[in-house]
């Protein structure tokens, strides 16, 4: 049985700012773009979250909820330096590390001899070491599979951890809401609830063939996760090539204004996700995806050096006009392709 740890730093960007400037610790702060430039919030500290300020929220809305919010532009070199230090701490315990972003990673400690092989104690020691060396707090989840470790890391935030032992998995899954499973969004959760499926325990009683007919390959993933099955390895060679966000509508849309409004809502989340893996927002390409009511889909991309909302909207409009053919649209997606590290190095050297 594997021993997987998911480590997730607590409000990472904001925590670095509070560490380096203690005067910020007890006041609401957020990292994000200015209201004048229609920026979005990347991270907010816990005092700000008490006012409802959240990641991916437009800065203007955040300031309405919390007028005395201290807005910081972000110091991504400092965040990267802290992230590298955290990664080095992980490497003291295992070489099997899969970074997901600057502030979270999976660790496979199945074969680790540290702490007498106890994943629970390893997670505790890693969190304590991070605090001792960086004065930052982390939360962790421990489980036999990746998706449960990720869910567990959110159970006792901030500065806590949660353990799901192999023996506890069946009982934990019985009452686990499907919306907690990574990849199950609001629309999917609503469709599942309409079918009477609210928890993993409900899905365990379902026929796999029915789920496959209704949801395609997602149906298999849903069934497997509900059984506690997740055979994905912690991939230390993992190199993220793209970042995306999409929305499946409860009802098909037929007017460009509806599509544009969805893009306006999706863009802040894309920006937030990209900032977690690529703080400078430099990219190779960006593009849009539309899926139609006949389940055909189309993707169109542009070579573009930096994330740009105006270009995404223009690309989507061109795709809407030229490829829709009068069909309803059931899904709108935005994505970026990241620069190849070797190409990025050449660009930097060229400067």
UniProtKB/Swiss-Prot annotation:
It is an enzyme of class 2 (transferase). One of its GO terms (cellular component) is cytoplasm. Changing residue 176 to F: In strain: ECOR 37UG. Keywords: Cytoplasm, DNA damage, DNA repair, DNA replication, DNA-binding, DNA-directed DNA polymerase, Magnesium, Metal-binding, Mutator protein, Nucleotidyltransferase, Transferase. Mg(2+) binds at residues 8, 103. Gene3D superfamilies: 3.30.70.270, 3.40.1170.60, 5' to 3' exonuclease, C-terminal subdomain, DNA polymerase, Y-family, little finger domain. Changing residue 171 to T: In strain: ECOR 45B1, ECOR 46D, ECOR 49D and ECOR 50D. Binds 2 magnesium ions per subunit. Changing residue 135 to H: In strain: ECOR 70B1. Changing residue 104 to A: Loss of function. Changing residue 310 to S: In strain: ECOR 57B2, ECOR 59B2, ECOR 60B2 and ECOR 62B2. The record marks 13 as: Substrate discrimination. Changing residue 170 to S: In strain: ECOR 37UG. Induction: By SOS response. A member of the dinB-yafNOP operon. Induced by hydroxyurea. Belongs to the DNA polymerase type-Y family. The catalytic core consists of fingers, palm and thumb subdomains, but the fingers and thumb subdomains are much smaller than in high-fidelity polymerases; residues from five sequence motifs of the Y-family cluster around an active site cleft that can accommodate DNA and nucleotide substrates with relaxed geometric constraints, with consequently higher rates of misincorporation and low processivity. It lacks the O helices present in high-fidelity DNA polymerases in the fingers domain. Poorly processive, error-prone DNA polymerase involved in translesion repair and untargeted mutagenesis. Copies undamaged DNA at stalled replication forks, which arise in vivo from mismatched or misaligned primer ends. These misaligned primers can be extended by Pol IV. Exhibits no 3'-5' exonuclease (proofreading) activity. Overexpression of Pol IV results in increased frameshift mutagenesis. It is required for stationary-phase adaptive mutation, which provides the bacterium with flexibility in dealing with environmental stress, enhancing long-term survival and evolutionary fitness. This is DNA polymerase IV.
